[in-house]
Amino acid sequence: MRPTAGQVFGSRYELVSRIAIGGMGEVWKANDGVIGRTVAIKILKDEYMGDPGFRERFRAEARHAALVNHEGIANVFDYGEEDGSAYLVMELVPGEALSSVLEREKILPATKVLKYVAQTAAALHAAHQAGLVHRDIKPGNLLITPDGTVKITDFGIARLADQVPLTATGQVMGTVQYLAPEQAGGKPASPLTDVYSLGIVAYEALAGKRPFRGESQVAIAMAQIKEAPPALPSSIPEEVRKL
């Protein structure tokens, strides 16, 4: 059954309005009736509740995000399962995803890109210090608040460095346009994987396009492994292009 406004989860979280619909579920604005704050609640789609792998990945998102306390990572407050549904309660971050910003503005000023990259890198460093690799850094997982603060979201496929993966050996996890070469080759991810993906995000924001293209996901993945990215436009400051 699809979530509806007024529905209550965990006897305390009342759904107010839908924020977004993603591949695994829906995100709603909700009121916490116990302590009186407004939160975001992600609800796993019904069709995935019968799949142990999806349910475990959903639980893992709660566990992983809770490992890191950093201003650049959206807080997770609660997790629950009831009546055939699973839900994740998170900090409600005002603003929009970087993907929406890029769709609207196409290219961002170098100063703004550097600011976003620095904030994201600091948050990733905190995650890496906790032994956590995000594995899916992309514009859609970077929320930009009205004051220009970056918040990383969606630790659903993140992995602890010393943890047995949730997926089969050699299975590729992540979004192909932002995959690091080792991910594209089915090898284990590391903190450098996130750094590479952040570099792809920066390239896209500066150039208005992604560095690697192809007619299929496989072709794009192979380009990540075998090709060097095209040079950034000469209109971008030299020190930024070198970085």
Predicted regions and their residues:
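Activation-segment/catalytic-loop signature of the eukaryotic protein kinase fold
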Residues: 79
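Protein kinase catalytic-loop region centered on the HRD/HxD motif
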Residues: 120-132
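AlphaC helix of the eukaryotic protein kinase fold
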Residues: 43-67
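Activation segment signature within eukaryotic-like protein kinase domains
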Residues: 116-117
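Conserved short submotifs of the Hanks-type protein kinase catalytic core
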Residues: 83-97, 101, 105
